[in-house]
């Protein structure tokens, strides 16, 4: 492999772009994976996800072992050392290989003069590992979350916050959605077993299957033919609560990447679905999903606050609003969220959610259903949001999900092994 494609240096660059520049790992990682051999793509992903999952610990270790931080053009070396720590702590990479490859990464980022420094810090960590980890276990950094988020979780969930944090720090399971227009869930589970894999049905969501061991999608029976889709169990709750019917006009708002759009069409293949998202680039994923599953929907780019721009005066029988949110319920799946979000974002997101709710509610027919959903666990975006909406919207009534004082259903991450998710089902009087 060429030196500029050193795996450890690429991982360090990816993490730096997330933490220092606020870029999403889902945007940063794919181009870097193109620079390495196919056999190394999984390791590069593991290093990036792992470092971001344990960033608080790795930062704490650097502060203990280095007298001053790396800054300026040497900043990538800071993250390269983190990659070294992560390998020594959490991977099966032999320590000598982890050290050698990480030190060599300095050449790839044009800092060969710092090879000795990197080697020295990593070896010092090896010598002091037990003492350092014992001290870390009593530090504030042990939660592996930014302090502002820990405080919010403690306030919202006085008896459950530790469980939420622990779930966020785990690797996520792989959930699938069986396409009921092709197979029953039990029938597809039989095909999965024939392929040498095992899956488990979800007790509440009728299409959901959890793989015993995550697998590449090309190994799943009928994936290319649209028999099955990768989608977390909690996300599948949206279509369950929406309960779409054939012949209805249905709006899926904030629809990208299209997992919920296609689930609606699996449940009601003859529904007339309009899928709208503000992000034109992400809409390409909606088209891809519709094509793979052989489905049709109208897809438009648009801002949820201004429905007249993308649907005129049209009204809908059902609306799914998967609102823009903090994504604090899917941290185990996207650990970069912890470092991309800021405390001040929550109030701004809650304001945006309220504006979208108020804008689309008039587009719901009398007697129609709106399901408000987020992948957040924060009350400001969920129960508080719906409580204030009900107070200012006299023709809105809660259905099935919670009570007026505690509206909606809040799934916490790890519950039945799904992600953190919130749903509120509203009926127009």
From Swiss-Prot:
Membership in a protein family: Belongs to the class I-like SAM-binding methyltransferase superfamily. RsmB/NOP family.
Residues the record marks as active site: 375 (nucleophile)
The protein's name in its UniProt record: Ribosomal RNA small subunit methyltransferase B
Binding site for S-adenosyl-L-methionine: 254-260, 277, 303, 322
Catalytic activity entry: cytidine(967) in 16S rRNA + S-adenosyl-L-methionine = 5-methylcytidine(967) in 16S rRNA + S-adenosyl-L-homocysteine + H(+)
Entry keyword annotation includes Metal-binding: no
Subcellular compartments: Cytoplasm
InterPro entries cross-referenced by the UniProt entry: MeTrfase_RsmB-F_NOP2_cat (IPR049560), MeTrfase_RsmB-F_NOP2_dom (IPR001678), NusB-like_sf (IPR035926), NusB_RsmB_TIM44 (IPR006027), RCMT (IPR023267), rRNA_ssu_MeTfrase_B (IPR004573), rRNA_ssu_MeTfrase_B_ent (IPR023541), RsmB-like_ferredoxin (IPR054728)
Organism annotation: Salmonella paratyphi C (strain RKS4594)
